[in-house]
């Protein structure tokens, strides 16, 4: 329930802060983690999609676990932990002062404006979530064909 999740993070205290992306995107919640490594200039954010996909950007393991534990309160039909672990993809990214791109499995995110940075991270997050979803669907189809 994405609406209840939004309300939870709106009333949440540190380290999690709900970040509005745009009124156009109602299928996602963005959370910024504020008390990670203070020397890091790269922000730590999480995109939570209404289909269950979760995309972490520069988030320490302990905070990932905290997010997953909070998600359990607001989710129906949770995916098994083994499935979540098997579908995990780790990609590298850097923040740059040019247009965002994907080159050789390295995501380059434009950090010249906070708004553009957030929208570009949303775009890449959505693409990654769809890629994982497509991969799961194809795997399921292969398994069905193998049973025939």
Predicted features by range, described:
Residues 1-135:
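Short Lys/Arg-enriched alpha/beta "domain-start" segment
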């Amino acid at each position: 329930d994405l609406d209840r999740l939004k309300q939870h993070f709106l009333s949440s205290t540190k380290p999690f802060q709900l970040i509005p992306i745009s009124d156009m995107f109602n299928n996602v919640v963005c959370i910024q983690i504020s008390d990670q490594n203070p020397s890091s200039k790269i922000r730590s954010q999480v995109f939570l999609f209404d289909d269950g996909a979760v995309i972490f950007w520069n988030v320490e393991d302990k905070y990932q676990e905290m997010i997953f534990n909070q998600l359990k309160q607001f989710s129906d039909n949770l995916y098994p932990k083994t499935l979540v672990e098997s579908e995990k993809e780790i990609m590298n990214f850097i923040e740059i002062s040019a247009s965002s791109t994907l080159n050789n499995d390295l995501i380059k995110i434009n950090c010249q404006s906070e708004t553009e940075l957030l929208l570009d991270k949303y775009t890449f997050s959505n693409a990654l979530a769809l890629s994982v979803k497509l991969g799961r669907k194809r795997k399921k189809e292969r398994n069905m064909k193998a049973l025939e």
